[in-house]
Amino acid sequence: MGNRTTTTFTTLTGETEHMEKKLLLGAEAVAQGAIDAGISGVYAYPGTPSTEITEYIQRATEGNQPSVHSRWATNEKTAFEAALGVSYSGRRSLVCMKHVGLNVAADAFMNAAITGVHGGLVLVVADDPSMHSSQNEQDSRYYGRFAMIPILEPSNQQEAYEMV
């Protein structure tokens, strides 16, 4: 669950405070950000590297609570629809998939962009725009532009945590 260290520092007012630091990989930072943001559901279709996000949440103490519904889906479309349903109920959800999975979820994704959401909904797509380690080249940012939704591109683990 990442390496943890505790740092003690003195504030400008002279008070001593303790801050826990976690050293996380990018997928772990996304997962921890979702947990700390208070997600109610995480849904995914297995496919590396997006699988690690859901697995981290399932292993984490905070993510393994009855208040966090976590499921592997039959495909990316059903994963997106489950997360969208949680969002329609006013709660926060996360859905994770590989780049080719967004093709499968495209119908639900585009319709959600039109109808909107009521709670938070974060879609994490693990892209491979230069076909480094996958069977095809795809840049899912074009889906985001077409749907006119915000596209977040963290450049490090801290940004990934904060953006989620």
What are these regions (language model features)?
Residues 7-157:
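Thiamine diphosphate
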Residues 164:
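Conformationally flexible catalytic loops at phosphate/diphosphate-handling active centers
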